[in-house]
């Protein structure tokens, strides 16, 4: 099949173009993070073999690439729990048109495997580190793995990553007062530290009410102390990224409750079971897997995605209390 013309690039009725695919490859996670899976992963009764296989991944990524997608983030659950994770990276990275291959991980396998992931084609990595206090890290994640994760980040730099992105979910009374420690940590390290506001999902209403805190106070502190806002590239995510001449690291803020947060939306999501999600907080998933079984199904796969895109909402409407069907962030890859 010939590559889509620019006019056929994935675009919705609000003229938002989609350069970025978040592809979940598993729902399984070995951590028990308070804000995601506090009781740990609960199997649905289906075998892990029900997750997308390599051939299905190759076909769906090619369809997205043929319509303008240039960045793929491999997510979970914890994606590195897949035994074929390195093969998945290679499959995505080998797809014509894909320029950036990223993953989001809890970091527990990084120290041992980050070199082979990089060799397979991974060129961006995000690691979840919700506290620099090992005891608080344990409390939030349910796992005593802080030093293991830190060693994995160090190893990423050793094998040649120029920058590591670190995700921190902001939570009142848990980690919201750790900004000074985080700033000290990134002063001489090329880390983009990303503070993410706690988001309300179907199973987390009480947690949200107890621990949600806005990132506005952090933003005001940064601006008052000489941090400057960077200009976004087309396929960048929603983070407002700040830089400072005295710091090697950067600070990103992801604040989904901000006005116009969705105006620059550039990503679509495919779940580990092959459903298209137009929004993290959407009210349904659209079956794509039946059109991932043969190479010659690509025109139909693209047509279905294009058609569904025209139903994408202008906003997530979180401010109006609409949290959609997402029970927790692990279910469609965050």
Swiss-Prot record:
One of its GO terms (molecular function) is S-adenosyl-L-methionine binding. [4Fe-4S] cluster 2 binds at residues 262, 265, 279. It catalyses: GTP + AH2 + S-adenosyl-L-methionine = (8S)-3',8-cyclo-7,8-dihydroguanosine 5'-triphosphate + 5'-deoxyadenosine + L-methionine + A + H(+). Residues 13-239 form the Radical SAM core domain. Its cofactor is [4Fe-4S] cluster. Pfam families: Fer4_12 (PF13353), Mob_synth_C (PF06463), Radical_SAM (PF04055). Transmembrane segments: none annotated. Binds 2 [4Fe-4S] clusters. Binds 1 [4Fe-4S] cluster coordinated with 3 cysteines and an exchangeable S-adenosyl-L-methionine and 1 [4Fe-4S] cluster coordinated with 3 cysteines and the GTP-derived substrate. Its EC number is 4.1.99.22. GTP binds at residues 22, 73, 104, 165, 267-269. GO terms for biological process: Mo-molybdopterin cofactor biosynthetic process. S-adenosyl-L-methionine binds at residues 35, 77, 128, 199. [4Fe-4S] cluster 1 binds at residues 29, 33, 36. PANTHER family: GTP 3',8-CYCLASE, MOLYBDOPTERIN COFACTOR SYNTHESIS PROTEIN A. Monomer and homodimer. This is GTP 3',8-cyclase. The lineage of its organism: Bacteria, Pseudomonadati, Pseudomonadota, Gammaproteobacteria, Vibrionales.
